[in-house]
Amino acid sequence: MPPLFLPSSSSALFLLLLLLLTLQTLTSISLSQPQALRSPEKCGNFSVSFPFQLSSSSSAAAFRLSCENSSTLFLHINHQSYRIIEFFTDGLLVDFPSSPSCRQFNDLRSFPFSANQFFSISFENVIGLYDCEDSSLCKFGCETNDLFGCDGREEDETSGGDIGCCYPLSDHSAWRVGDDFSVFSRYGCRGFSSWLVPRGTNRGKRGVKLEWAIPRNSPEAICDREARTVNATAIEGSVRCVCRDGFVGDGFLHGTGCLKSCFKDGKELYGDKCKIKKHNGKKLTVLAGVLAPLFILGSLLALFCLLKRPVTSHKDQQFDISTTTTTTNSVSFRKGYNKTRLFTYRELEEATKGFQDSQKLTQGKTGTIYSGNLTNGTRVIVHKVLCENQIEFMEISSQIDHLSAVLHRNLARIIGFCMDIGYNPLVVYEYPVNGSLGDRLRLGLDWCKRVNIVAEVAGLLALLQYENYPPILHTNISSGNIFLDEDFQAKVTGFGLQRKQRIDTSMYDFAVLLLEIVTGLKQREETVTQALQKIRSGKLEEIVDPSMYFHEQPVAFREQIGLVADIATRCVLFGGDGKFGMVDAARELLQIAGNNGGGGCDKKRDGIEETFSNSSLLQMISMSPDSIYLPKT
C-alpha cells in the first residue's frame, strides 16, 4: 500500500499556537522589569520583615509592632509590651517588660506571658534560677554555657556573679510548652535570669526568646513557590515559610516571597539581576525584530513538511523488525508459578487510551507507569519498561520471567505482559484499590500506616536482593511505584532493567522514600540535603508532615518518627560502603512497626507481628507462608 499523506490538524494548531506565544514573548521581553526585594520597614537599626509590620494595615494584629523614638521596637501581647533586642528567622529576643535596667535576677512573675497561636517561649532559652529549695531542678552540663551578666562579663564566681541553678527549657521535665516562668516557684525558687543559647552553640544572649509562627489554616501562612513549610517547634498547629537554598526573602506569598540570590562584582543581587546575561530594551527589540521573521519562515517550512510526511505504521517504531523477527521464539516464560497472560500491544494501547498523558501515573528511571482498563472492565497498571536495543529487550524479558516466579504478598501481582518485537516491553500489574503511596500521602495518611508500609517495602527489597539468584534490585523505588490494597498493604511495581545499578544507589532511593514518609513531600536532591541537615541539628519537628500534627502525636510515635528519620540518614551516609544495607533497614523498620500493636494503631499486620531471629536473613525479613500472595485459581 502506498504511504498515506494525511494533514495533521492538531500538529498544525500546535505550531500556530507556538508561533503566537513566541512572538508575544519576543515583543514583550523588553518591557519586563527585573525583580527586586521590596524594602522592609525600618525602625532605627531594625528591619521589619513579614509577618511583622509597623503600619496599621497589617492583616494579623498579633504581629503589629510599635516604634518609639524612631529607634526602639516593641511587641505587644495581652496588654504587655516587650522591647525587642534582636530578630531571628524563627523568633525574636525580647527584654523583660517594665524593666528599666538590667538585673542579675528577676522575680518569677516579672515576665507575664501567655502562649497563643502566634507566640510561645522558645525551647532555646536557658534559665538561671536563684535560691531554689529543690536542687533536682539543676541540670548537669548546663552551666558549661557561656552566659553573660548585665555588665557583659561571663556569669561565674570569679566575676562576682553566679547563675545559681541552671535549667535548659529544652529539658521539658519541669517546664512545658504553654507554661510561664512562675512554674519554677513549685521548686522553691525565688528569682531567675534568662539567656538564649541557639542550638549548636554554647554562647548565651541575655533576654527571652519568643518563637513566632502563623496558624496553619490562615491565609497568611501560604508559602512562596520557592519556599517550604516548616512546623513551629513550640506552637502547636502553626507554621513558618523558609526559602530554599539559593533564594532569599521571608518565604511568604503575601510578603517578599523568595528571590534568586547571587553575587556579582562583590555585590549581592536578587531576582532577574542574577541572570547570566543582561540586555537593554533596545537590543532586545532589535533581536526580536530579527528572530521573529526567521521563526515564521522556519515554522511554515516545518508545517509544510509535517503535512507532507507519510503516516508510518507502529511497527516501524523503536526496533528494526527485519532484524529481530527471528528472536521471538527465544523469549521463554516459565509457567505454573503465576498464571500470567500474554497481551498484544494493541490491547494495552487501547486499555491506556493510546498511552495518553492523562493515564500516566508516574515516570522514572525504569520507564513510565500508566493506568488502564481492559476490555472486561478490569483496572490494571501498565509499566512501559525503558528499553533501548535488542540486548536490553532480551535482558528485560528474562527478568520479567524471573520476577513472575516470585510470590510475595508485597509484590504487586503480575497479570501479564507484552513482549511484541518492535515495542517497549510492557508489564501488566493488578491495580490495588487505594492507589499509589504518593497520592495517599498527599491526601493524608496516619503514622501507623506509613511505618507499616515502609517496613513491608524494606522486607521485600531485602528478600529480593539477598535471597534470590540472580538478585533482583529495584532500580527506581519511589512512592509512585508503591501501591496500596484495601488493607493499605504495600504492593511494589516498577521493576526495570538493572543496567549497572549499585546497591548504594538503591539505598539512597530508599532514604528518599523514608524522608517522603516523614515530610509528606516529594523529595528532590536539594530538599533531601535540607531535610538531613534539619535532622542532624535536632530540628526534626520542622520538617514533619504538617498533616500528622507532630506535637499532638503520642510520645511513642514521635520517637518512631525520629527513628525512621535516623534510618534515612544512615542509608545516605553508610549505604554506599555497605556498612548499612537493606537488611539492616528492614530489621529496624520491622521492629518499629512490630511495636505498634497498641498505642493507637488498629492492629498488627500478619507479617509484621512475627518475631524475627537475627540468626537468619530469611527468618528476619521473609513473610510467613500465610502472608505470601497466591493467585486465585
Curated annotation (Swiss-Prot):
Entry note about domains: The protein kinase domain is predicted to be catalytically inactive. Lacks the conserved Asp active site at position 476, which is replaced by an Asn residue.
Binding site residues for ATP: L361, T362, Q363, G364, K365, T366, G367, T368, I369, K384
Source organism: Arabidopsis thaliana
Similarity comment: Belongs to the protein kinase superfamily. Ser/Thr protein kinase family.
Regions that span the bilayer: 286-306
Protein name: Probably inactive receptor-like protein kinase At2g46850
Keywords recorded for this protein, A-Z: ATP-binding, Glycoprotein, Membrane, Nucleotide-binding, Receptor, Signal, Transmembrane, Transmembrane helix
GO MF term (any one): protein kinase activity
Sugar-bearing residue positions: N45, N69, N231
